[in-house]
């Protein structure tokens, strides 16, 4: 993101601060006084940038380029977004959040494409895509992402599973742990791996405190870790994927969800039903309709946009991610 006449926001403030500290002799406005750090890029700032360009043998256009920002250690914070099953990476609650913050000059938005149309899920493709992006020092369009750049991540539904797997396998305990110190914010929406009892206070329909994601035995625990205070979970009560109980009924839901979303299977719902019965053991006849209904419900949620979430990011989610630039 370049800075030019009319630019405003946190990045302009950071640039002004660096110029005042490092180039005090010429970080002066047209009136000869030191630049005023008001977060606005005007004629005073343009004058200083042209002098910087002259001294660094560049064309003197008064525009702070991505290359200049990188040279000054001012690469813009990056927000990665991972939408849900059968999604378009450019649209959804994650995309809306990051798009708005990019428009406000807070951060640069990098959507993440992965194989989101498969059932069973192909979460590994999302983890690999994130590993390639976060592990690089330059994003695909040339945006600088050097070590030390603040960054954040948002995931929704299947994308929340991808984000959780990525943070768990690559950032907390993996080859990209060098990015951990610069991870400022992570946010999961409707996460099947939601930690039990963890939910943001601004959820419009908060779940019961003694619930977690449908993947009961694979909850993404951040409490007591280095991510505590940096990771948030937003969940709406009634979302089968992110609201489950740690009891026999909850374990049955987890088993069915695991078979549908993660295991290899062929033969449609009949094959799934056979595998579920084999997994659950002796099932009384009167329980079969309930199991069938549960399979149908999870199949529907796995194959369709989640009905429990709007496609517009909530204010609390946006403000949480805004701190990526703090």
Which role fits each region the language model picked out?
Residues 81-113, 117, 124-140, 169-326:
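Surface cap/lid and interfacial helix-loop subdomains adjacent to catalytic sites
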Residues 12-16, 46, 69, 94, ...:
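Extracytoplasmic/secreted envelope proteins and their assembly/folding machinery
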Residues 136-150:
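Gly/Ser-rich "nucleophile elbow"/oxyanion-hole loop immediately N-terminal to the catalytic nucleophile
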Residues 75-77, 146-150, 181-183:
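A general structural motif
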Residues 153-164:
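Gly/Ala-rich beta-loop-alpha elbow adjacent to hydrolase catalytic centers
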């Amino acid at each position: 993101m370049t800075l030019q006449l009319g630019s405003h926001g946190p990045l302009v403030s950071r640039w002004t601060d660096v110029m005042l500290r490092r180039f005090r002799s010429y970080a002066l406005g047209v009136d000869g006084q030191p630049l005023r750090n008001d977060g606005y890029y005007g004629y005073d700032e343009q004058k200083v940038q042209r002098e910087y360009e002259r001294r660094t043998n560049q064309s003197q256009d008064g525009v702070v380029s991505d290359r200049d920002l990188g040279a000054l250690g001012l690469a813009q914070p990056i927000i990665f977004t991972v939408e849900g099953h059968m999604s378009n990476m450019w649209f959804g609650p994650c995309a809306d959040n990051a798009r708005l913050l990019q428009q406000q000059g807070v951060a640069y938005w990098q959507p993440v494409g992965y194989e989101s149309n498969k059932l069973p899920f192909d979460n590994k493709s999302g983890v690999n895509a994130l590993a390639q992006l976060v592990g690089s020092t330059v994003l695909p369009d040339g945006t600088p992402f050097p070590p030390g750049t603040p960054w954040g991540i948002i995931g929704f539904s299947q994308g929340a599973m991808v984000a959780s797997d990525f943070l768990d396998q690559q950032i907390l305990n993996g080859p990209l742990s060098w990015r951990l110190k610069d991870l400022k914010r992570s946010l999961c929406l409707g996460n099947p791996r939601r930690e039990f009892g963890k939910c943001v206070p601004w959820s419009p329909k908060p779940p019961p405190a003694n619930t977690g994601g449908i993947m009961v035995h694979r909850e993404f625990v951040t409490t007591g870790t280095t991510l505590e205070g940096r990771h948030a979970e937003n969940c709406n009560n009634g979302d089968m994927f992110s609201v489950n109980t740690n009891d026999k009924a909850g374990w049955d839901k987890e088993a069915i969800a695991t078979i549908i979303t993660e295991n290899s299977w062929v033969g449609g719902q009949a094959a799934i039903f056979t595998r579920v019965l084999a997994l659950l053991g002796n099932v009384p006849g009167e329980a079969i309709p309930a199991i069938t209904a549960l399979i149908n419900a999870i199949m529907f949620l796995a194959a369709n946009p989640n009905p429990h979430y709007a496609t517009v990011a909530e204010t609390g989610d946006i403000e949480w991610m805004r701190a990526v630039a703090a």
